[in-house]
UniProtKB/Swiss-Prot annotation:
Localisation: Cell inner membrane
Keyword Ribonucleoprotein: no
Native organism: Rhizobium johnstonii (strain DSM 114642 / LMG 32736 / 3841)
Region feature Disordered, mapped onto this chain: 37-76
Any one GO cellular component localisation term in the record: plasma membrane
Signal peptide (residue range): none
Protein name: Membrane protein insertase YidC
CDD domains for the chain: 5TM_YidC_Alb3, EcYidC-like_peri
Membrane topology recorded in Swiss-Prot or TrEMBL: Multi-pass membrane protein
Keywords: Cell inner membrane, Cell membrane, Chaperone, Membrane, Protein transport, Transmembrane, Transmembrane helix, Transport
Known partners and oligomeric status: Interacts with the Sec translocase complex via SecD. Specifically interacts with transmembrane segments of nascent integral membrane proteins during membrane integration.
InterPro entries according to UniProt: Membr_insert_YidC (IPR019998), Membr_insert_YidC_N (IPR028053), YidC/ALB3/OXA1/COX18 (IPR001708), YidC/Oxa/ALB_C (IPR028055), YidC_ALB_C (IPR047196), YidC_periplasmic_sf (IPR038221)
Length: 598
């Protein structure tokens, strides 16, 4: 029974950690995000009352020390902003929008394959919008020069494009700009069928003097996302920059202090959301300085940018540069494909696989394999769980073999307790000697529990972060595996015309999970200690309410895992000659307790 008690204490400790972790990592950030969103909205309303919208974009001050930071955004509707300057239409299988010829900005982009809700008639996702709108978000590539070089392409430079130009996956567009010093900039923009833009620039010097230039690239965003952030997921600045490797910086950290990694060669940088991202891959052979910055003038503005070392274009010569711009959904095979085909270092880390990367990503690959076969990610979760249980079967077998041996040792353990009733140290020494003689490892039963913790959190990451799970249906009422079960027992699962308090929302799948957890715990004898027994009885109920707000896919996994565990434990216990006490324990719940003898 000591082994069982030890396992109970471990389970209790883990349960407490999970509950506290859930509160700290999930609920607290949601509450804080809602509070900040309300404060930001109030501050914005106050700002709009005293600040008149700027009339058009103004060229920011440009220095040789950093990329342009943009300007405080005006507040205009999308339609008004799109009419302020000429544009080139973007139309591909995955994207729609336009390129702003003022600055050659990519600032109008929608993702055709994704809707805001599970309803296909809902609006498609807007990734980029012009700086003049409330939540402006764009990428821009330009140059920094000196008075001697004349005007060079920057935020307000008006490029020219052929009449009727249209960017598709098959037809690139070519933009051009010539200044009064004889510098001609020719920019060819192409895009593939998904989300990667290639921007190839050619600079020709037809003037009389050498031209010293630096190129820059930036991803600029006005205001933070309004979706609640959680600590298990990184949203904000991201990049793989030279020897510094992967850098993930929260918005809040940059608000306190700008981040400027060491000068580097190679890599990429940008801004990432849960499902979407915008990144720039600079020319990989040139040294550059990267910056993650925050600007508080006007609307809050966040910027990831780079500026490369100065280079010189001699008279009569030309130079060519190429940048890559990723703007779209973080689809796993697409991201992996870009990493391989463009040799972008660690580009797959754009998806937040977490600390258990070596488990999380292979688990997604396995799940994706089953999805391709069955066409349903819910079924893929069930199949993946079976594979994981099969892999852990030898460990589980050892665990229950250890439990069987411990149960066989109970009579001897009781004798030792009676013999050393007043000698705690002597009991411990005698117990350890008994373990040694019988070749029993008292902690053998703990390893399967400990080893499955990374598996659980890795699966949670897969379900929570991968866009493939977004709006992925199961069967029946589950239309989105990445969202909580929408049903609730409060209104009898939709039969009554009200919702009830959110705290009491308890869907069908959390109920199923609670029942399976209850049955699994009844496979073992109830602890003799009253406190342990009380926790033993209440744990399924606590977990039901705790998991009610978790993604439905995770709850389905847990319920299915419990079911498989019951079957697995019963099989192993029979193989080792241990009585399965499930039905006896269930019957014991309904037996009337005998009155104590007087």
């Amino acid at each position: 029974m000591m082994e069982n008690n030890r396992n109970y204490f471990i389970a209790i400790a883990l349960s407490v950690l999970i509950v506290l972790g859930w509160q700290f990592l999930y609920m607290n950030p949601r509450i804080e995000a809602q509070r900040k969103a309300q404060e930001a909205q109030k501050a914005q309303q106050q700002t709009e009352q005293v600040q008149q919208p700027a009339a058009g974009g103004q060229t920011p001050a440009q220095t040789s020390g950093a990329a342009p930071s943009g300007q405080a955004a005006a507040t205009a509707t999308l339609e008004q902003a799109l009419q302020k300057s000429p544009r080139v239409v973007i139309d591909t299988p995955a994207l729609s929008g336009s390129i702003n010829l003022a600055g050659a900005r990519l600032d109008d982009l929608k993702l055709k394959g994704y809707h805001e809700t599970v309803d296909d008639s809902s609006p498609i996702i807007t990734l980029f919008s012009p700086a003049e709108t409330k939540d402006g978000y764009f990428t821009e590539l330009g140059y920094i020069g000196s008075d001697a070089t004349g005007s060079v392409p920057g935020p307000s430079t008006l490029w020219t494009a052929p009449e009727g130009a249209k960017l598709t996956e098959k037809t690139p567009v070519t933009l051009s700009y010539t200044n009064d010093k004889g510098l001609t900039f020719t920019r060819t923009i192409s895009v593939d069928e998904r989300y990667m833009f290639t921007v190839a620039d050619k600079i020709e010097n037809t003037g009389q003097a050498p031209a010293a230039l630096s190129s820059y690239g930036r991803v600029t965003r006005y205001n933070k996302p309004t979706t609640p952030s959680v600590y298990v997921l990184h949203e904000g600045f991201i990049g793989v920059i030279g020897d510094d490797g992967l850098i993930e910086t929260k918005y809040s950290a940059v608000e306190k202090e700008a981040v400027a990694p060491a000068k580097s060669t190679g890599g990429w940088l940008g801004i990432t959301d849960k499902y979407w991202a915008a990144t720039i891959v600079p020319p990989q052979s040139a040294a550059y300085e990267a910056h993650f910055s925050y600007f508080a003038d006007g609307q809050p503005r966040y910027q990831a940018d780079y500026k490369d070392d100065a280079f010189t274009v001699a008279p009569g010569q030309s130079i060519e540069l190429k940048n890559l711009v990723f703007a779209g959904a973080k689809e796993v095979p697409v991201i992996d494909g870009y990493e391989a085909s463009y040799s972008i270092p660690k580009f797959d880390r754009l998806i937040d696989w977490g600390w258990f990367y070596f488990i999380t990503k292979p688990m997604f690959k396995l799940m994706d394999f089953f999805f391709r076969y069955f066409g349903n990610f819910g079924v893929a979760i069930l199949c993946t769980t079976i594979v994981v249980k099969a892999l852990f079967f030898p460990l589980a077998s050892k665990q229950y073999a250890s439990m069987a041996n411990m149960k066989r040792m109970q009579p001897k353990m009781e004798e030792l307790k009676a013999k050393f009733a007043d000698d705690r140290m002597g009991l411990q020494q005698a117990t350890m000697q008994l373990y040694k003689e019988e070749k029993i490892n008292p902690i053998a039963g703990c390893w399967p529990v400990a080893l499955q913790i990374p598996i659980f959190f890795s699966l949670y990451k897969v379900i929570y972060i991968t866009i493939e799970m977004r709006h992925a249906p199961f069967f029946g009422w589950i239309k989105d595996l990445s969202a909580p079960d929408p049903t609730t027992i409060v209104n009898l699962f939709g039969l009554l015309p009200f919702e009830g308090p959110t705290l009491l929302h308890l869907g069908v799948w959390p109920l199923i999970m609670g029942v399976t957890m209850f049955v699994q715990m009844r496979m073992n004898p109830t602890p003799p200690d009253p406190t342990q027994a009380m926790i033993f009885n209440w744990m399924p109920l606590v977990f039901m309410f705790m998991l009610a707000s978790f993604p439905a896919g995770l709850v389905i996994y847990w319920a299915w895992n419990n079911t498989l565990s019951v079957a697995q434990q019963g099989l192993i216990m029979k193989r080792h000659g241990v009585k399965v006490e499930l039905f006896d324990n269930l019957k014991g719940l309904f037996r009337r307790k005998e009155a104590p003898s007087k």
